[in-house]
Amino acid sequence: MLSSTDFTFASWELVVRVDHPNEEQQKDVTLRVSGDLHVGGVMLKLVEQINISQDWSDFALWWEQKHCWLLKTHWTLDKYGVQADAKLLFTPQHKMLRLRLPNLKMVRLRVSFSAVVFKAVSDICKILNIRRSEELSLLKPSGDYFKKKKKKDKNNKEPIIEDILNLESSPTASGSSVSPGLYSKTMTPIYDPINGTPASSTMTWFSDSPLTEQNCSILAFSQPPQSPEALADMYQPRSLVDKAKLNAGWLDSSRSLMEQGIQEDEQLLLRFKYYSFFDLNPKYDAVRINQLYEQARWAILLEEIDCTEEEMLIFAALQYHISKLSLSAETQDFAGESEVDEIEAALSNLEVTLEGGKADSLLEDITDIPKLADNLKLFRPKKLLPKAFKQYWFIFKDTSIAYFKNKELEQGEPLEKLNLRGCEVVPDVNVAGRKFGIKLLIPVADGMNEMYLRCDHENQYAQWMAACMLASKGKTMADSSYQPEVLNILSFLRMKNRNSASQVASSLENMDMNPECFVSPRCAKRHKSKQLAARILEAHQNVAQMPLVEAKLRFIQAWQSLPEFGLTYYLVRFKGSKKDDILGVSYNRLIKIDAATGIPVTTWRFTNIKQWNVNWETRQVVIEFDQNVFTAFTCLSADCKIVHEYIGGYIFLSTRSKDQNETLDEDLFHKLTGGQD
């Protein structure tokens, strides 16, 4: 047993700075400790010496030199390696953070700076009533995001006049679980599936929620369109390299905010990171659908994703329609909403979920192998040869497409048979010009084979396009998503149909919004305001009867149909190469893209990946595929951990199923994305 003299010799002084909640400046507290004292004992000594009566349960020790939290309170100082020269800070784990949402609304709320980002985002989404938090993450804005503001404010501070939604009361400073917001007793938020208004019955159960009914409407309804001047002031990427810069700031999901240098009250962006949207349901996802619509809208307006002028006008018409409905008194009048019975809503949702198949057609679906057979025109690009289409007899079965010289030779050997699994499917459509084409980029050993198919009419195009899209994902036309995909394509084509000039002329005088607000600045420059308004109203005739939530879902579906949808770009250099390339990361594949031309060079599917890892010394990502195929690259526009996490994150999301509840296997996520640092 140690005497007091021996203890004094074995002990040492430890200086801890304390974040006093009611004082602006931090104060140092000196403790006498020994190496076998556990962290919980250090905190107990601190609280006793501070001698202020308050709840200290949210406080923890932060080790500045090691940049880590000392959260294992049963560990001793010796086990952590803490010595007398350690700089420790006794500080709250929950701090204020400003988040810019996809609809550009700023919210200020209390967030855990000690939990890993994956968990912090989950808590944030519970406060904001956004299901499937695994699809979102936090992005640190690049300097380009603030480039216009720098001219006005060198410190990059937000304008004082900005209206910030303050949710400071959640979660509590003591670190208790987050408020359930507008969630019902089963933690399921309920909204009107037509206009997205929250069901009033859930509001009475949680009157202390920081997300009041008024605040919920701010998050569930589209914000008024920005002026053309404000649009012009926003950063717009002009090349794939510029787009790659947008994705450099994703935070590491396996580390805490504090560990990544995020300061209290700093501004971060909350964004949908993974373009794999699971189980979107208007009854429960009004906020999620609106924020997803807003992220898609800004991607179109700022040209973060390419689209044709015809498609831009469709998006503009939908925006105009959504803006009108969002501003109308009907949609914002909550008082007249009837209460939604939770059990009825759950049963109704179950009916919708199970509606896909009927019992009498089940046997037919199992035994029948769907097949498409028709005359299509084919063109294969060759250097120095003009673009000439030639007609062949095509058969589409399973995930393969074969073609013959004519129908009579169908029973013989095809001229060529191609498996479309893993191919790129790009629409090549001009409805006004009656052009319905499909561009296929089929991966081969040395790159990509390019071919074009030309259909005669909308129905033929919708059937073959849907079949190609499913085959690229490894699915056949027997899949339940085939017919809905055909209908979605037809719906999008009908939105592009031109309407009579008389209808447009009568509406032109009633357009009470600036048409330049609904298109990208470059598109606006190509048209006079009146001409642009006429074309938007012309397209609007096809969507004028849509309810609000349906219009948002149509916008999201149209966004998903764009060739570049779901691709996140990074500037990389492949092993053995002397030039930089672009790596596109999608929900099911990686694409090597020529940085100069934007043309895909090689595609690798996630289903063919055997393993992937990071060489942390060389900062190189190494991927092994089937058949002993390897590729390796270094990331130039971002940390290699970000790309590593993207691959693992998408593979993690592919494990979700509707049979599961909404509880995620967080350990599996970190196993797939964490790497070994």
UniProtKB/Swiss-Prot annotation:
InterPro entries: Band_41_domain, FERM_2, FERM_central, Kindlin/fermitin, Kindlin_2_N, PH-like_dom_sf, PH_domain, PH_Kindlin/fermitin. Induction: By TGFB1. Expressed in brain, skeletal muscle, kidney, colon, adrenal gland, prostate, and placenta. Weakly or not expressed in heart, thymus, spleen, liver, small intestine, bone marrow, lung and peripheral blood leukocytes. Overexpressed in some colon and lung tumors. In skin, it is localized within the epidermis and particularly in basal keratocytes. Not detected in epidermal melanocytes and dermal fibroblasts. One of its GO terms (molecular function) is actin filament binding. GO terms for biological process: basement membrane organization; cell adhesion; cell-matrix adhesion; establishment of epithelial cell polarity; integrin-mediated signaling pathway; keratinocyte migration; keratinocyte proliferation; negative regulation of canonical Wnt signaling pathway. The modification Phosphoserine is found at S170, S179, S361. Keywords: Cell adhesion, Cell junction, Cell membrane, Cell projection, Cytoplasm, Cytoskeleton, Disease variant, Membrane, Phosphoprotein. Residues 377-473 form the PH domain. It comes from the Eukaryota. Interacts with the cytoplasmic domain of integrins ITGB1 and ITGB3. Involved in cell adhesion. Contributes to integrin activation. When coexpressed with talin, potentiates activation of ITGA2B. Required for normal keratinocyte proliferation. Required for normal polarization of basal keratinocytes in skin, and for normal cell shape. Required for normal adhesion of keratinocytes to fibronectin and laminin, and for normal keratinocyte migration to wound sites. May mediate TGF-beta 1 signaling in tumor progression. This is Fermitin family homolog 1. It comes from Homo sapiens. The gene is FERMT1.
